[in-house]
């Protein structure tokens, strides 16, 4: 079964969203979450990757993440 991926480009520093990311992993312990700070990038500060083999689980985790972050913190979701 392939690993599915969602990418979230965030306009906040990693340290500013660390509590939300930790809470997300507590709620979705099977989620593979990557956090990649982007220095010098003007449109976003952190690229988050969410990975799972279960499409429903991945979508629920993505929805939970988006619900935890202020809407103006999200640059885009792919």
Q: What residues fall within each predicted segment?
A:
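Non-catalytic beta/alpha edge segments that cap or flank active sites
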Residues: 1-78
